[in-house]
C-alpha cells in the first residue's frame, strides 16, 4: 500500500473528485443488486467471483461495458477454462459483503474471489477496525472453500485527515498480506487524475475508461488462474 499515484497535484485532483462525489449525495448509498455472469458458464470450468460495489457493478453504463464484464470477455478469449460471475452490488459496504460472502461462495463455488469493497466505508467515515474485520471475514470465507483471493483497494482524499486516510489505505493490502491473499492497492489508479474518465456525477467511471481498469486488474488476477 506504499504505492503513490502522483504528486501533490494528483492528490488535489482526486480530492476534488471525491468531494464532488460526497456533495452529490454519494450514489452508492442506495444498494442495487447487479449479480450476473459475464460469460455463459461451462460445465467443468473454474469460476472467478467478483464481490464489489458500484465501481464493479457497471453503475451508469451498460453491464457489458464494465471492467468486470470486460475481464470476463478476456477470460473467455484467453483462458477459456474459466468463467466469471459478477456479484457486485451498488451501495455495498464491507459489512454487506461480509454478511453475504458465505452464501455467495457456496452458490458459485469459485476458485478465485476478487473483493472490491471498502470505498463506502471510508467515505462515510466508518470505523476502520470494522473494515479490516469485514475484509478478513470475506477473505477467510473465500479461502475456506479453497479459493484464491485478490483484494482491490481504494484511497481517500486528504481532507479525511492524514491518520485516517493512511490507515484506510494500509488496511486492504495489510489484511491481504496477513491472510496470504493477493492485493491491488488502488482500482482507479490509471484514471484517477482524469476528470473526463468519470460520469457527470464525478464518481463513476465512464464506459470508455473501463478498459483501463480491466487492464489494471488483469496482471494481478492472471497469476491466480493457474
Model-assigned labels for residue ranges:
Residues 2-15:
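Bacterial N-terminal signal peptides that target proteins for export
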Amino acid at each position: 500500500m506504499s504505492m503513490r499515484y502522483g504528486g501533490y497535484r494528483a492528490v488535489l485532483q482526486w480530492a476534488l473528485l471525491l468531494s464532488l462525489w460526497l456533495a452529490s449525495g454519494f450514489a452508492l448509498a442506495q444498494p442495487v443488486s447487479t449479480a450476473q455472469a459475464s460469460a455463459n458458464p461451462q460445465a467443468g470450468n473454474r469460476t472467478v467471483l467478483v464481490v464489489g460495489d458500484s465501481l464493479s457493478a457497471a453503475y451508469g453504463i451498460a453491464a457489458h461495458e464494465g471492467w468486470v464484464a470486460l475481464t470476463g470477455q478476456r477470460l473467455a478469449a484467453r483462458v477459456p477454462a474459466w468463467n466469471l460471475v459478477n456479484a457486485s452490488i451498488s451501495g455495498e459496504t464491507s459489512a454487506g459483503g461480509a454478511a453475504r460472502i458465505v452464501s455467495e461462495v457456496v452458490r458459485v463455488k469459485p476458485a478465485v474471489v476478487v473483493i472490491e469493497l471498502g470505498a463506502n466505508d471510508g467515505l462515510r467515515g466508518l470505523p476502520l477496525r470494522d473494515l479490516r474485520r469485514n475484509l478478513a471475514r470475506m477473505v477467510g470465507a473465500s479461502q475456506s472453500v479453497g479459493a484464491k483471493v485478490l483484494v482491490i483497494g481504494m484511497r481517500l482524499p486528504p481532507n479525511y485527515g492524514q491518520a485516517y486516510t493512511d490507515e484506510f489505505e494500509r488496511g486492504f493490502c495489510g489484511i491481504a498480506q496477513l491472510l496470504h491473499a493477493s492485493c491491488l492497492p488502488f482500482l482507479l489508479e490509471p484514471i484517477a487524475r482524469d476528470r473526463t474518465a468519470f460520469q457527470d456525477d464525478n464518481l463513476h467511471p465512464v464506459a470508455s475508461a473501463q478498459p483501463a481498469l480491466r487492464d489494471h486488474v488483469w496482471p494481478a488476477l492472471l497469476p491466480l488462474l493457474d
